[in-house]
C-alpha cells in the first residue's frame, strides 16, 4: 500500500478534509503524486461534499477536475443502498469531446483504487486471473463516456442498458439524446449531483437550449457545481441554471506586489513579443531556439481553421526538422482530431500543436512548456485559457503573444487591466530583413510547387482578416493599421486575395510576383485536368479573364456592407409598393373601396381571434404543467 500523504495542521492536507475522505481516496492521491490539495481543491471539496451548491472560479491548471470528481465519487459511495439499475446518480457535462474524454480518464484512474468499482468498469476476461466478485449490494461507481462522432446514439443506449452506469460524462448534445430514452431514469430518489465543467464556455458555444432541455429532465433537489477559469464573466447567466444559494469559490494568485491580482498560475510566465508583420513567422524559430532547455511540448495558437490548414504546410519548412508539427482544429473529423491529439501528447520528440481555440479550454495536456499566440484571440476571455495550457499543476511554463508594432502594443495595458499582466519576452530577439525575405522565399517555393497550396493560402488569409476585423478590442486591433503587403509576403502569398475590402488598395497586389497563371498547375492530376478543361471551355466561349473579373467585381460587395445594402433595397421596395398601392386605391370606385375595407376588417378580427386562442392554449398548458409538477418552485425557463 502506498504511504499516506503528509498530514498535520495544514488545511491543504488530504486527511484534513471535513467530512473526511475515504482511505482508498487518500491512497489514490498519494499514488498519483498529489501530496497535498491545491487551493481550489481545499476550498471546493469540503463544500461540495457538505451538500452545498458551488460556483468555482480558479486559475487554469489549478486542479478543478479532482475538485468535483472526488465529491461525486464520495457521495455515491456513501449512499444507504446502491442506485437502481438504469438509474443515474451523477452527470458531468463538458463543452468538448477532448475535455470529456480527459475527465473520464481521470475518473477511471481514480476508481482503479476502489476494487468494486474497478471490477465493474473492467470485468475480467481472463479465466486464469479472475477479478474478485462483489455482492450486488456493494456500492460502486460505474461511469460511461458519451461522445458524438465516435459512437451512435443507439450504441450508447445499448452500452447503458448492458452496463447500467450510474455516472455519465458527456458533451451536451449526446447526453440529451440518451436522457430522451424512456429506459434512462433520473428520479429524485437516485440523482445526486450535476457538474458543469468550463461552465461559461458551455453557455458561450450555443448550448443554452440543449442545457435547458437537460435541466428539465433532472430533479430540482440536487447538488450542482459549476467550474471554470472565468465564471465571473458569465455569472448573470449561470446563476439562473437552478442553483440553490450557491457558495462562490474564487481562487486567485498573488502578483509581484503581493496582492491577489492575477488569474493565472504563479508558475506561468506570460510575455509578449513585438514583431513587424513581415517577420512574424520568421520569429517563431528564434523563439523556439531561445527557450532553454528546448521545449518538448509547444502549442501555437492561430485564429482560424483555414489558418491551421495552410500553416501546417508552411511552418515545418520554416522551423526545420527539429520539431514535429501537428495540426488540430474543430472542423477536423472526430477520428482525425483524436488521432492528432494522441500523436501530440504521446510524442517523445519535440512537438508543436498548431491549433485554434478548440484546444484553449479545459484540455489537460501534460507537460506543455511553451505557448505561442501567433494571433491574439478575438475574444479576450480566451487569452487566459490559451496561456493556461502551460504552467499547469505547478509546472513551470512560458507563454508568448505576438503583437505588431504601434497600436497593438496597447494590448499590454489592456491585459493588465484584466489582471493578466504580460512582460517583454526575454532574451531580446533581433530581426533582420534578410531573415524575413528568406522565410518568404521558402514559403513561396512550396506554394509555387502546388496550386492547391496557393488556394489554401488565399482562403486562410481572407479568414484571418475577417477574424481580425471582428476583434472585440477593435480600438487596438484596427484594420486601417494593417500593412497588407508585409502581411501577404509573410504568409508566402503570390498575390493578395480578391477581397472587396481591398478594392481601394493602391499598393502592389501582386506582391512583386510575376507568374504565368494559366500554366500554374495543381499537383493533383485530376484537379489539374479539370482546371485545364475549364480554361479551354472559357477560351472557346470567348469569355476572357478580364470580362469575368469585371462581372465578379460588379457583383461583389464587401461583407461588412451587405446588411446596409439589403436595408436600402428593402426600403426602396416598400416605397415602391406604397406608391403602387396608392395609385391602385385612387382608381377604385367607392363600392370597391368599401369591399376592401370590409375585407381588411375581417382579416384583422380573425388575427385577433387566433392570437387569443393561442394565448388561452399557452395558459392552459402552463397550468397543466404546474399541476403535474406538484412543486411550488419556479420552473427553469432557460438562460435568456
UniProtKB/Swiss-Prot annotation:
Helicase ATP-binding domain sequence ranges? 45-249
Domain of life of the native organism: Eukaryota
Motif, Q motif: chain positions: 14-42
**Motif DEAD box in this chain: where?**
197-200
Composition skew (Basic residues), residue ranges: 568-582
What job does the chain carry out? ATP-binding RNA helicase involved in the biogenesis of 60S ribosomal subunits. Binds 90S pre-ribosomal particles and dissociates from pre-60S ribosomal particles after processing of 27SB pre-rRNA. Required for the normal formation of 18S rRNA through the processing of pre-rRNAs at sites A0, A1 and A2, and the normal formation of 25S and 5.8S rRNAs through the processing of pre-rRNAs at sites C1 and C2.
Q: What is this protein called?
A: ATP-dependent rRNA helicase spb4
What is the gene called?
spb4
Amino acid at each position: 500500500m502506498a504511504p499516506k500523504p503528509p498530514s498535520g495542521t495544514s488545511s491543504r492536507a488530504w486527511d484534513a478534509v471535513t467530512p473526511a475522505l475515504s482511505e482508498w481516496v487518500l491512497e489514490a492521491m498519494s499514488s498519483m503524486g498529489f501530496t497535498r490539495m491545491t487551493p481550489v481543491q481545499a476550498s471546493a471539496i469540503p463544500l461540495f461534499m457538505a451538500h452545498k451548491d458551488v460556483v468555482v472560479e480558479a486559475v487554469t491548471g489549478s486542479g478543478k477536475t479532482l475538485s468535483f470528481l472526488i465529491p461525486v465519487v464520495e457521495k455515491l459511495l456513501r449512499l444507504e443502498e446502491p442506485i437502481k439499475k438504469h438509474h443515474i446518480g451523477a452527470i458531468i457535462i463538458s463543452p468538448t469531446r477532448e475535455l470529456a474524454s480527459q475527465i473520464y480518464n481521470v475518473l477511471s484512474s481514480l476508481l482503479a483504487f476502489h476494487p468494486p468499482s474497478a471490477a465493474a468498469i473492467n470485468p475480467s476476461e481472463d479465466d486464469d486471473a479472475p477479478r474478485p466478485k462483489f455482492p450486488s449490494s456493494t456500492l460502486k461507481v460505474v461511469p460511461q463516456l458519451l461522445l458524438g462522432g465516435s459512437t451512435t446514439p443507439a450504441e450508447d443506449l445499448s452500452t447503458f442498458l448492458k452496463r447500467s452506469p450510474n455516472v455519465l460524462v458527456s458533451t451536451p448534445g449526446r447526453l440529451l439524446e440518451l436522457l430522451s430514452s424512456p429506459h434512462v431514469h433520473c428520479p429524485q430518489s437516485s440523482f445526486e449531483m450535476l457538474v458543469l465543467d468550463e461552465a461559461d464556455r458551455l453557455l458561450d458555444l450555443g448550448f443554452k437550449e440543449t442545457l435547458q432541455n437537460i435541466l428539465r429532465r433532472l430533479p430540482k433537489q440536487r447538488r450542482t457545481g459549476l467550474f471554470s477559469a472565468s465564471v465571473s464573466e458569465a455569472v448573470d447567466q449561470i446563476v439562473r441554471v437552478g442553483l440553490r444559494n450557491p457558495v462562490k469559490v474564487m481562487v486567485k494568485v498573488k502578483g509581484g506586489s503581493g496582492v491577489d491580482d492575477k488569474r493565472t498560475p504563479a508558475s506561468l510566465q506570460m510575455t509578449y513579443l513585438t514583431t513587424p508583420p513581415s517577420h512574424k513567422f520568421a520569429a517563431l524559430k528564434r523563439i523556439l531556439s531561445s527557450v532553454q532547455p528546448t521545449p518538448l511540448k509547444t502549442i501555437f495558437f492561430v485564429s482560424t481553421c483555414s489558418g491551421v490548414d495552410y500553416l501546417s504546410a508552411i511552418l515545418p519548412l520554416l522551423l526545420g526538422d527539429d520539431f514535429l508539427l501537428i495540426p488540430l482544429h474543430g472542423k477536423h473529423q472526430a477520428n482525425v482530431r483524436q488521432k492528432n491529439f494522441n500523436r501530440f501528447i504521446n510524442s517523445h520528440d519535440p512537438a508543436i500543436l498548431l491549433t485554434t481555440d478548440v484546444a484553449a479550454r479545459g484540455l489537460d495536456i501534460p507537460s506543455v512548456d511553451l505557448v505561442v499566440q501567433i494571433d491574439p484571440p478575438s475574444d479576450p476571455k480566451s487569452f487566459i485559457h490559451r496561456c493556461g495550457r502551460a504552467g499547469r499543476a505547478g509546472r513551470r511554463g512560458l507563454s508568448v503573444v505576438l503583437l505588431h508594432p504601434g497600436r497593438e502594443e496597447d494590448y499590454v495595458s489592456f491585459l493588465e487591466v484584466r489582471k493578466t499582466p504580460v512582460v517583454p519576452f526575454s532574451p531580446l530577439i533581433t530581426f533582420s530583413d534578410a531573415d524575413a525575405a528568406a522565410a518568404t522565399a521558402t514559403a513561396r517555393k512550396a506554394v509555387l510547387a502546388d496550386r492547391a497550396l496557393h488556394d489554401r493560402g488565399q482562403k486562410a488569409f481572407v479568414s484571418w482578416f475577417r477574424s481580425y476585423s471582428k476583434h472585440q478590442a477593435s480600438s487596438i486591433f484596427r484594420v486601417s493599421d494593417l500593412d497588407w503587403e508585409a502581411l501577404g509576403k509573410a504568409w508566402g502569398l503570390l498575390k493578395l486575395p480578391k477581397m472587396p475590402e481591398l478594392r481601394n488598395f493602391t499598393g502592389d497586389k501582386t506582391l512583386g510576383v510575376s507568374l504565368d497563371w494559366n500554366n500554374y498547375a495543381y499537383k493533383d492530376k485530376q484537379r489539374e485536368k479539370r482546371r485545364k478543361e475549364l480554361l479551354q471551355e472559357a477560351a472557346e466561349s470567348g469569355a476572357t479573364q478580364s470580362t469575368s473579373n469585371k462581372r465578379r467585381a460588379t457583383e461583389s460587395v464587401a461583407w461588412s456592407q451587405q446588411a446596409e445594402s439589403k436595408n436600402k433595397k428593402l426600403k426602396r421596395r416598400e416605397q415602391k409598393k406604397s406608391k403602387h398601392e396608392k395609385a391602385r386605391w385612387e382608381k377604385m370606385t367607392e363600392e370597391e373601396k368599401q369591399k376592401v375595407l370590409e375585407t381588411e376588417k375581417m382579416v384583422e378580427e380573425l388575427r385577433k381571434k387566433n392570437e387569443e386562442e393561442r394565448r388561452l392554449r399557452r395558459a392552459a398548458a402552463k397550468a397543466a404543467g404546474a399541476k403535474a409538477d406538484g412543486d411550488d418552485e419556479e420552473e427553469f425557463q432557460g438562460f435568456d
